[in-house]
Amino acid sequence: MNHSEIRRKERLAEVREFAEENQIPVQNIQLLNTALTHTSYANEHKNEVIHDNERLEFLGDAVLDLVVGEYLFLRFPSWPEGELTRAKASAVCKPACAECAAKFQVGKYMRLGKGEELSGGRTRISILGDAFEAVIGAIYLDNNYEVAARFILGHLKKFLDLIDQGDYDHDYK
């Protein structure tokens, strides 16, 4: 077994550990591995076939919006569209997603390029928030909508509770 094969097996073991620690059901470990791979890492390893998490982030963002939108729609049947939009924006914003990602240690398991690593990428809000969305995309593809929804609602509970209390009109920008 050569060095790259050993490293690949070690990496997949790390990703399995991440999944187990966070109770993420996994059929296809490679999806979760991709979700935890930043563009900077993929760009530095062009000689290998490594996919970054941007496509999964795109999908995860859509699933996140749908799940939170559905939750708010059903939870607050008398709210007008504008109120639902403001509440959803507070729950799915990058800082909220980054906080969730930090709680389940996404930064520890991210594959980052050398520059991102040196500049504090493991704790950067944009990287963590994007990775949270990518993990959601991986969970959705690897399982189904219901599993992804449970994951999202469980991790966003703090922010959804704030909405229940009427505390959601924050400007995080």
Where are these regions (language model features)?
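Double-stranded RNA-binding/processing signature
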Residues: 1-173
